[in-house]
Amino acid sequence: MPLPTMTHSSSFLRLPATSSPHPPPADDASAAYAVVVLNQRLPRFAPLLWDRARLRVCADGGANRVFDGMPELLPAEDPDQVRMRYKPDVIKGDMDSIRPEVKEYYSNLGAEIVDESHDQDTTDLHKCVSFITRNPPGSEESNLYILVLGALGGRFDHEMGNINVLYRFSNIRIVLLSDDCSIFLLPKTHSHEIHIERSIEGPHCGLIPMGSPSASTTTTGLRWNLDNTSMSYGGLISTSNIVEEETVRITSDSDLIWTISLRN
């Protein structure tokens, strides 16, 4: 029996007036976006995604990044007005990184502060994703996209913890984003169609079997396609591949990490 197909698109990074050579996936128009901001430098497109999101959550010190970083990304605007406009709905985590004055500022503006310092077994991103899945901004979980800003860069163990969250919540569409690339999980329960937004992403990409080896992965749309190919750490992994077509199709017997470069 063929696997059900999951479609993917980075159309959320497309500027509002930008056209695309192909329409977004059918479920894209009904997508409900939630943004999570972690404690790393904001990517250049943070204001765009913030405006598209229905729910905005800062993970602890991520609130500092919004407070400091949004005015830097919008230098032509009054910093105080920017800070008031880009107010998180929720600040959640251990509360060991957020500056006291930032916490007070957003609390006074009505942000919900959720102190989970009692929980030292999960990361701040895990806590935020758990909160969003319990309080989804849309009516259907299948339409939920969680866009994570600041998930890459900084300490390697933090990056690996963030990637682990993709596996912990494999039934949720979670995209890790930096200025340089995006990363998301391709669950083995589905075949996958990735609609490439050439104006904003590519051409470099990778398919990585981080959770477990893959005995069989097949792709189309790449320069170096895989044909029932096995992949594992210590063996072959598909890095520095090149997107050749508008749609990349992937099937695998293992969960895979997909990553693609983002254009400046």
Curated annotation (Swiss-Prot):
InterPro entries reported for this sequence: Thi_PPkinase, Thiamin_pyrophosphokinase_euk, Thiamin_PyroPKinase_B1-bd, TPK_B1-bd_sf, TPK_catalytic, TPK_catalytic_sf
A Gene Ontology biological process term: thiamine diphosphate biosynthetic process
Annotated localization: Cytoplasm, Cytosol
This protein's pathway: Cofactor biosynthesis; thiamine diphosphate biosynthesis; thiamine diphosphate from thiamine: step 1/1
Biased composition (Polar residues): 1-12
GO cellular component: cytosol
Molecular function GO terms recorded: ATP binding; kinase activity; thiamine binding; thiamine diphosphokinase activity
Family, per entry: Belongs to the thiamine pyrophosphokinase family.
Protein name according to UniProt: Thiamine pyrophosphokinase 1
Source organism per UniProt: Oryza sativa subsp. japonica
Lineage: Eukaryota, Viridiplantae, Streptophyta, Embryophyta, Tracheophyta
GN (gene name): TPK1
